[in-house]
Amino acid sequence: MYGVLSSPLELTGDFEKDIDIAYEYFSTAINDRKKRPTLFDKEVFIEAHEIIEGRPEGFWHVISLEENHHFKVLPCVNDGNIELCNQNCNASHHAIVVKYGAETRNVCLLRASRLPWIIDIIKLAGKNDSSVNVWLKPGTGRQNGKLYLRYNHHGADFVLIFSVEKRFYRLISSFPVFYTNEKENFDKDYRKYAWSYFDT
């Protein structure tokens, strides 16, 4: 049986209000260590060292995308959020600077609306639910291994990527998967690196 994801956050199209809505969810469900689920008996770490506009960098990272990423097809093309953001992913009218000034990212209301899926997918993976493909790519040199959780059912294709640390998994990215080549690459990686905590 496949698990089902929560409904996306209901947004308004007013960027400031929508960022507040997303941040309220992030603060209570994701950033609160007492409420945040564990993953395979390890804590999930959310980056919070850098505070930008009163909010941790980890929040901005999961609701935005790199400014230099230009889309041929918008990720929200079949989603109601396309009417709300005025193509901010390409227009850059709502940008945030992270990594102490080293990177500019564009706020993405599609990603913001999908914040509940981060918690859902972590919980489903923790139950060994067949809706989530899990794979572990080994690190190279000084680079840590990467743990991938991909939900691809009921019309939703969404991936979480974690850096594997000694005592925790550090969330480094989460996003909808919509490019054909990206889907194929993830399918290929899953076939090569499939991993199960429950078989170890």
Q: Residue ranges of each PLM-predicted region?
A:
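Ribonuclease/tRNase effector modules and their secretory precursors
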Residues: M1-T200
